[in-house]
Amino acid sequence: MILQQPLERGPQGRAQRDPRAASGASGGLDAREPLRKQFLSEENMATHFSRLSLHNDHPYCSPPRAFPPALPPLRSPCSELLLWRYPGNLIPEALRLLRLGDTPTPHYPASPAGDMMEL
């Protein structure tokens, strides 16, 4: 990215690239008037980015604040942490039963053979 001064219009309506040319200054660089252009090179950008930090340690940042915890501290993680699962998903239950070697107990009691629904 190159930053430079805006172009000025001369008396004839054409754009002048160097305002010193209109005042009669020589075409060379004048030591009394610094050039106000800043050229950013790849090396300058690499140096700039290598100095950046992901931590909140920049001088323009406010001191780090302690944020309140999102969840209150757990007294007993085993008894208080409950993960919700979709009620229709029986795969985890089947895997648990396979690991334990138990026979599955049906969620709904089996109806007697004589109780059949008529449609």
From Swiss-Prot:
UniProtKB keywords: Cytoplasm, Nucleus
Motif (Nuclear export signal): 91-100
Location, primary (coarse class): cytoplasm
Region (Disordered): 1-34
Keyword Cytoplasm included in the entry's annotation: yes
Pfam families: HPIP (PF15226)
InterPro entries in alphabetical order: HCFC1R1
A GO cellular component annotation in the UniProt record: cytoplasm
Cellular localisation: Cytoplasm; Nucleus
Region (Interaction with HCFC1): 57-60
Task performed by this protein: Regulates HCFC1 activity by modulating its subcellular localization. Overexpression of HCFC1R1 leads to accumulation of HCFC1 in the cytoplasm. HCFC1R1-mediated export may provide the pool of cytoplasmic HCFC1 required for import of virion-derived VP16 into the nucleus.
Assembly and interaction partners: Interacts with HCFC1.
Name the record gives this protein: Host cell factor C1 regulator 1
Protein source organism: Bos taurus (Bovine)
Encoding gene, per UniProt annotation: HCFC1R1
